[in-house]
Curated annotation (Swiss-Prot):
A Pfam family: MerT
Function text: Involved in mercury resistance. Probably transfers a mercuric ion from the periplasmic Hg(2+)-binding protein MerP to the cytoplasmic mercuric reductase MerA.
Species per Swiss-Prot/TrEMBL record: Shigella flexneri
Domain of life: Bacteria
Positions with a binding annotation for Hg(2+): 24-25, 76, 82
GO CC entries: plasma membrane
Name this polypeptide is given: Mercuric transport protein MerT
One Gene Ontology term of the molecular function aspect: mercury ion transmembrane transporter activity
Length: 116
């Protein structure tokens, strides 16, 4: 029996795509801040050409998560996860946390020159 879709997968995909989209710029700064160093950190820039694809994937995943999480309660069948108010509130909170993280990750390459 298949598990009902509840938006969790789309949230995960959006967060992962945002992380991948900012790896070329945010990754080296985080690694240096954590004490890692070396010439290999510069190799993370090879992901820069794929950044638009990762951004698109993040935005599409967030759209589908939003569509799934903010659907009317009447669209949920009784007994489904989306019919439980506490679960709906938790998913909405997680959605907005992931959305903020995606926006930070997408905007970080434009702010990073101020840190160097």
């Amino acid at each position: 029996m298949s598990e009902p879709q509840n938006g969790r997968g789309a949230l995960f995909a959006g967060g992962l795509a945002a992380i991948l989209a900012s790896t070329c710029c945010l990754g080296p700064l985080v690694l240096v801040a954590l004490g890692f160093s070396g010439a290999w950190i510069g190799n993370l820039t090879v992901l820069e050409p794929y950044r638009p694809l990762f951004i698109g994937a993040a935005l599409v995943a967030l759209f589908f998560a939003w569509k799934r999480i903010y659907r009317p309660v009447q669209a949920c069948k009784p007994g489904e996860v989306c019919a439980i108010p506490q679960v709906r509130a938790t998913y909405k909170l997680i959605f907005w946390i992931v959305a903020v993280l995606v926006l930070v990750a997408l905007g970080f390459p434009y702010v990073v020159p101020f840190f160097y």
